[in-house]
Amino acid sequence: MPIDDAERERRRALLHAHYDVENAHDLDRIMATFSTDAEMLYNRQSFGDPKSIRTAHAYIGLSSTGGAFRGIRNVIDREHFTTDEIVVEGRLCGRHVGEFQGHSATERDVELPFVAFYRFGADGKLTSERVVMDLGRLAERA
């Protein structure tokens, strides 16, 4: 059954609130967007509890202490709505300054394209975040 305009706008607002706090690098506020039983999948790696979800966000660089990327921001290029999810085509942008998923730091500014699938509960909290990101640009050397 297709979603109505009100539900589409509710989900869009929740998604943009999540991206806003990610781009502000505020881990506490990022975690406040997740339900306590949420699951995050990143390139098929599962993070099934709040502690591991928090650690994964910090590892990437979405915290005030930094991580594999500096000056990181997630950019939404397109949004698509299904009955249950929002599908985002986007880019992670930042300087690759630390090891990430087996790729040593390149010290280059990169844009990594991704597709992400978000599911929100009735309470407005994320219950599922699944991200598939193309890391090929990290293997390229200048």
Regions found by a protein language model. Name each.
Residues 1-13, 142:
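Basic/polar N-terminal segments that are highly enriched at the extreme N-terminus
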Residues 85-87, 109-140:
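Short beta-strand edge/turn micro-motifs at domain boundaries
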Residues 8-12, 27-86, 91, 95:
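A solvent-exposed, acidic/Ser-Thr-rich amphipathic alpha-helical stretch
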Residues 98-107:
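Short, surface-exposed loop/helix-turn segments at secondary-structure junctions
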Residues 17-18:
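Generic hydrophobic alpha-helical segments
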